[in-house]
Amino acid sequence: MSKECKICGKKPMVGNNVSHAHNVNKRRFNPNLQRVKALFDGQVRRIDVCTSCIKAGKVVKAPTMGQGKVTSAS
């Protein structure tokens, strides 16, 4: 699984763990990625998307089996 959002391109950032004694250790801040079945380039695909893109509505989720059926009211 790649550590990059396919929508916004968000990648891991580098920072520091800082203790109370001000000892510094390097660390990585990974984006919160979720594997989502979505419409991507006109096809239904599983893509890695960050939660901020999902929350902002930038991802069009693929219809599931139950959705999209038209029922007649007779």
Curated annotation (Swiss-Prot):
GO BP: translation
UniProt superkingdom: Bacteria
Cellular component per GO, a single term: ribonucleoprotein complex
Keywords on record: Ribonucleoprotein, Ribosomal protein
SUPFAM superfamilies (alphabetical): L28p-like
Pfam families found in the cross-reference section: Ribosomal_L28
InterPro entries named among the record's database cross-references: Bacterial_rp_bL28, Ribosomal_bL28, Ribosomal_bL28/bL31-like_sf, Ribosomal_bL28_bact-type, Ribosomal_bL28_sf
One Gene Ontology term of the molecular function aspect: structural constituent of ribosome
PANTHER family registered for this protein in UniProt: 50S RIBOSOMAL PROTEIN L28 (PTHR39080), LARGE RIBOSOMAL SUBUNIT PROTEIN BL28A (PTHR39080:SF1)
NCBIfam families reported in the protein's UniProt record: L28
Family: Belongs to the bacterial ribosomal protein bL28 family.
Protein name: Large ribosomal subunit protein bL28
Organism: Desulforapulum autotrophicum (strain ATCC 43914 / DSM 3382 / VKM B-1955 / HRM2)
